[in-house]
Structure formats: C-alpha cells, structure tokens
C-alpha cells in the first residue's frame, strides 16, 4: 500500500529501494537544495508543520529503518546518483563511457540538471564528441 508519511525531523531515515538495492538515506539528503532534483522535490514536501514523504511503505528490512520508498530504476547506477545527492560538485565520476551515458539517463529521470551537465562534460572530455559539447561552457 502506497501512502504518505509525515516526519517532524529532517534527520529521519528512509530506505530507498532502487532496482533491488537498498539505500539508507536521511530525509535531509533528499531535501538538499543544491542537489535535489525534481523527482525528490515531488516525493518530499516540506511545510511548517512537518516533512511529508510520498510513496512510503512499511519496511521489513533487517536494519533500524522502518520506512521505504520504492523506485523502479537501476539499483547499481543509483549509488552514483546518491553520491551526487550527498556530495554535489565533489562527486567522483566514473571513467567508463557506457556508465556515464547510463548515468545521464538516470540524471534526466531524477531531474538532476547540474549532475547531468557534469556527466556530459566528462563525456565530452573523454570522447570529444560534439553531442556532449553543448553543456561544456567553462574552461576547466
């Protein structure tokens, strides 16, 4: 059963169940204004009274977190997405072209425009392909 749950603290934890992989994450990570994409802005709603998370289910995972949100995406790739949500610009990017291209699709799904630009910039540097050039604006 999918429902909405209210938290009174942004330090609360959720399990994100992505493509068969479990990712424990604090609600405040999903709310980070510098990295939060449109997907998580839709899932996490902040008001004066509470923080509401849509799509929460009771979790029977063997950790201390009792609530989870299911996301039908690639669970292995999501570890890179979560690293970006936690670290922003300091995120390390893989050097594998296939993984980078796959992450571009994940960034688009989650509405992470800055992450998408970082990935395309790295792809442009690795491949020199013009299709990635449009996002490359600075000189570093």
Curated annotation (Swiss-Prot):
InterPro entries: SKP1/BTB/POZ_sf, T1-type_BTB. It comes from the Eukaryota. One of its GO terms (biological process) is protein homooligomerization. It holds the Pfam family BTB_2. Signal peptide: none annotated. This is Uncharacterized protein F47D12.3.
């Amino acid at each position: 059963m999918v429902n909405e749950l209210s938290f009174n603290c942004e330090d609360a934890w959720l399990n994100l169940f992505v493509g068969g992989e479990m990712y424990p994450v604090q609600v405040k990570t999903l709310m980070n204004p510098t990295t939060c994409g449109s997907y998580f802005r839709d899932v996490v709603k902040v008001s004066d009274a509470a923080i509401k998370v849509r799509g929460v289910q009771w979790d029977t995972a063997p950790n201390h977190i009792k609530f989870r949100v299911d996301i039908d995406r690639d669970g292995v790739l999501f570890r890179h997405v979560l690293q970006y949500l936690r670290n922003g610009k300091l995120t390390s990017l893989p050097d594998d072209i296939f993984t980078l291209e796959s992450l571009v699709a994940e960034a688009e799904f989650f509405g992470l425009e800055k992450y998408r630009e970082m990935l395309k910039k790295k792809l442009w540097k690795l491949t020199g392909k013009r299709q990635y050039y449009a996002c490359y604006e600075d000189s570093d």
